[in-house]
């Protein structure tokens, strides 16, 4: 059976190294399925899951959370370089939930802050428009009352 070697590398070292018959990844340009004999390529990855169907057990799929990075396919050797990557079995789900809640809280606070700034900016725009309208009116009055 044709196979590929798949390695996932992070700054912390090699995170995954197995033989595979199929890989599914999400690149910046969309989803990609890779089989043995795939053309050589390099593509930037989205923050998404990586699906690897292993050769030693066709019914077994390894799922890896990849934090962006790049994928290189060259002669049935697939290298994924990412800032971080975790296999499904290594992920602490409760810790991930806490991180999600923190991120949502920060996002909500930042959204409120942006909206408050936008409101102030809108107010500033309203003030500026009023000042311009006042200057135009004063100018028209001044010109209109000139002695001819």
Swiss-Prot record:
Membrane topology according to the record: Peripheral membrane protein
Annotated keywords: ATP synthesis, Cell membrane, CF(1), Hydrogen ion transport, Ion transport, Membrane, Transport
Gene Ontology terms: cellular component: plasma membrane; proton-transporting ATP synthase complex
One term of GO molecular function: ATP binding
Transmembrane segments: none
Main location: membrane
Domain of life (superkingdom): Bacteria
PANTHER family assigned: ATP SYNTHASE DELTA/EPSILON CHAIN, ATP SYNTHASE EPSILON CHAIN, CHLOROPLASTIC
Protein family membership: Belongs to the ATPase epsilon chain family.
Role noted for this protein: Produces ATP from ADP in the presence of a proton gradient across the membrane.
Subunit organization: F-type ATPases have 2 components, CF(1) - the catalytic core - and CF(0) - the membrane proton channel. CF(1) has five subunits: alpha(3), beta(3), gamma(1), delta(1), epsilon(1). CF(0) has three main subunits: a, b and c.
Protein name stated in the entry: ATP synthase epsilon chain
């Amino acid at each position: 059976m044709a196979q590929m070697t798949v390695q996932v590398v992070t700054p912390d070292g090699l995170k995954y190294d197995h033989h595979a018959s199929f890989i599914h990844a999400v690149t910046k340009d969309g989803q990609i399925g890779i089989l043995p004999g795939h053309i050589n390529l390099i593509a930037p990855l989205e923050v998404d899951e990586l699906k690897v169907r292993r050769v030693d057990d066709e019914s077994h799929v390894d799922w890896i959370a990849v934090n962006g990075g790049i994928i290189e396919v060259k002669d049935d050797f697939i290298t994924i370089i990412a800032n971080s990557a975790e296999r499904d079995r290594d992920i602490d789900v409760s810790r991930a939930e806490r991180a999600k809640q923190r991120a949502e809280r920060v996002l909500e606070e930042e959204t409120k802050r942006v909206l408050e700034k936008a409101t102030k900016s809108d107010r500033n725009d309203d003030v500026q428009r009023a000042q311009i309208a006042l200057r135009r009116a004063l100018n028209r009055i001044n010109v209109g009352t000139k002695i001819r």
